[in-house]
Amino acid sequence: MPRNLFPLLYLVVLLAASHARAADPLDDYLSLDLQELLSLEVTSVARKKQRISESAAAIFVITRDDIRRSGVTSIPEALRLAPGIQVARIDANKWAISSRGFASQFANKLLVLIDGRSVYTSTYAGVYWEVQDVLLEDIDRIEVIRGPGSTIWGANAVNGVINIITRPATESVGTLVSVGAGNEEQLVALRQGFALDQGGAGRVYAKFNRRESSYSPDLNGEAGDDWDKTQMGFRVDLALSEQDSLTLQGDAYQANENQVLREFILDPADPANLPPDPQHPFLIPFLPDAFESEGYNLLMRWVRDAGDRQNNLQVYFDHSDRQEQVLRQRVDTFDIDFTQNIKLGRRNELVWGLGYRRIGDDFDNTFRTIFYQDPQIQELYNLFVQDEFAWREDLKLTAGIKWEHNDYTGTETQPSLRLLWAQDARHAWWLAASRAVRTPSRLETNSSIAAYQLPPDPADPVYYPSPGVVRLEGNPETKSETLNAFELGYRWHLDEGISLDLTLFHNRYSDLVTFEATGSLSFQVPNPLNPGEWFYPPNSLTYDNLRDATSQGAELSLDWQAHENWRLRANYSWLDLSADVDDNSTDAFGDTVLKGSSARYQWSLRSQHSITPELSMDLWIQHVDALSRSGFSRPRSIPAHTRFNLRMAWQKDDLELSLVAFNLLKDRHSEFGAENIFVYTDVERSVLATLRWDF
């Protein structure tokens, strides 16, 4: 994406602002009672519109007003608002986000969508969170499903689905200018919305944000992970007829990111790599890495609503280009998806759909990371059907199944069965049993990674005279990881303005990926993943599926409208995760990291208080239990920590001025270990002042 396009779009937005129309006032969800909030419609559970109270799934909605009043400036930070979602900042531009365990930078059991467009990367099996962005003011809601959603959304929707849904362009006619500055972050955003003929509308936006470097205990100072990103985009909504509507939208971004690599392994065959350390001659203790990432996407959605039948056709293309020292990659994704919703009488409703996805990737191989079969094309085909049958007015049964074919493991089957009982106007119960799979990534099937370097053998310099590198080799026979999940949910609502949402779950995982040795050397060396321990290093490692796991837990959210201008919300989640490795496995460290990276419990409390029509105050406190071994390549024990944020805002007509203080309790704290080979970092206290003009 040429850089000169970004300032050009800024100019276009500024010129368009001179023709601004009046904008709708900010939504005030405090004016809604809890019954109305429970009646908010969601679409991610069943690929159709339904109220939260009618959903047989553990779903939570983060509203636009929740995001605004929290003061957060990114999608990852907004996800801290949801119960059962573990969000940990690894450094200034990386996060570990997961649902119901298995936290890591690339949490491979969580599917993330933006307006139905998957941002899950098949390279690592996860999400590059720092480049997943939209204009936060244009988000309508974030639908967070905890638990499997694979019958509807396919493979990798194992432990949860996050769908970030933006507002129609008809709801953003007018001009928005937002500017923020603080000791850790600076941002500016511009958006112009305009009306079109026959009830249509469009908008364009541009935004820039920069985050300063965090603190690194490894470096005893700045972590060298500062970054900035420029993004622009558009959306057009057209009413083609009384039944047909068309949406066109797209985004483009360019990010300049920095990171410091710890113990980076150089190519010993390269004469330019001089040996600074006789014991580790090709190992650089700290290597700064400045790189660019850029990408764009285009999406088209056509909807025909004929009353008892609705058709939905969505097509998108996504391009990303990422040039790190660790891995240089370019990925293109084309996806087409068709869904039809049919009402079969008064009690029966059928949803079915089919889809095709083509992923093309290309890598610049380095000594550290090699991809075989480069470039490669992957193709996926899927078909699903789901039927909802109302036995009685208060009892609904939903049964569905999805077939999906991929190039790695062939055809995968993912069924689900859900039952909802609306006991009365105040009480509702639901049950669910589901099967979901996580398909292997490109990395796990046909790659080679320089995992760590070994020192020479002091006892036998003839047999092993020089340092060696242990490589992790991909395995084309890697199987899909499988989950069988069982859930029980309960919702309770009182007229006095109190609601409760409780979910219990039991998950059984099989064929989880392990790291297996292919032979071992004759001498012991320090274990790079467990300091203080020694082990016989392998000649090389490879992937296999020799681990099973079990988890159970509870997730609770409480909502109390204490007064017409004061609302309290509390969340609590508890998780117990255990794993068993096959007797034939040589994986010596996976279980420790698997269990140690997920918080056993966490809780939060939020207070939203509109003191006067112009002045509001929001308090948010969150506590996360200790992590015994978080991060894979460089695990780290993380003490329990408590975050406390305070936001004060003054609003007059179209103008809002806010001041947010983040992490008030401590100067800095740790949240996660180091993924890959990055240095440890801490999250620091920060303040941010924002001025927003929406007219």
Annotate each language-model stretch with its function.
Residues 43-60, 76-118, 140:
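Extracytoplasmic beta-strand/coil segments of soluble accessory domains associated
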Residues 118-146:
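Short acidic/polar hinge/loop motifs at secondary-structure boundaries
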Residues 151, 163, 170-172, 191-291, ...:
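Periplasmic-side early beta-strands and strand-to-turn transitions of outer-membrane beta-barrels
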Residues 193-195, 239, 431, 593-695:
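Conserved C-terminal beta-signal and adjacent last beta-strands/turns
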Residues 239-255, 287-411, 420-424, 498-504, ...:
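Face-selective signature of the C-terminal outer-membrane beta-barrel domain
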Residues 241, 347, 374-510, 608-614, ...:
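Structural signature of Gram-negative outer-membrane beta-barrels, strongest in the C-terminal barrel
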Residues 308-323, 422, 428-430, 462-465, ...:
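Membrane-embedded beta-barrel scaffold of Gram-negative outer-membrane proteins
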Residues 390-394, 505-509, 528-631, 690-694:
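Gram-negative outer-membrane beta-barrel transporters
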